[in-house]
Amino acid sequence: MDTKSLLVAAALQVVEQQGEAGFSTRAVCAIANVTAPTLYHHFGSADGLLSAAITEAFAQFLMSKKAEAFSADPVVALRQGWDNYVRFAAERPRLYAAMVVRVLQGATIPAAIAGRALLVERIAAIEADGHLAMDVEAAADLIWSSAHAASTLYVLAPERQPDPIVVTTLRERAVQSICSPIGSEKPA
């Protein structure tokens, strides 16, 4: 692994263990076994390194979504993708929180944009099957916001896992909201 990749991996480790608030170049340098000038040579600043680490986290997240085998049934595949999203946040709550903060700060992250496109693709497959009850973009907003809400439960209280019934209910209500009952027509 080259020095730049080593620093990004070390930064991810620090964010996962300490959160963005606990991020320090000293901790990253200790893990990567480099000096501060090496870090600044590659990234210019602590924020430059943190941005690179968050970009890598989004790339890892997108890779996990693309690598997972999904059902041929588009509604089942949507549920599986939703579960994958929430599982990532549950397993890596501090990193997920840092990722969301970067997006809220207006960062343009290609893997985040690609992740949204993947969600829209999955919902378009539901529309192609004739089971979408609303516009594809509106449905994507609803599904993403429900997955984000469930994920936030893991971030806000990492020591106390949310009740699985709450998480499942969030998913099912969102999916039911965007899907037309079988045999019905999409509203005009």
Show which residues each predicted segment covers.
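Short alpha-helical functional segments enriched in proximate histidine and acidic residues
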Residues: 14, 64, 88, 122
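Alpha-helical DNA-contacting segments of helix-turn-helix folds
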Residues: 15, 49-57, 99, 108, ...
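Hydrophobic, amphipathic alpha-helical faces that serve as interaction scaffolds
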Residues: 95-98, 104
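Helix-turn-helix
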Residues: 3-6, 10, 14-48, 52
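Hydrophobic/aromatic-rich alpha-helical bundle segments in the mid-to-C-terminal region
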Residues: 101, 108-109, 113-116, 126-176, ...
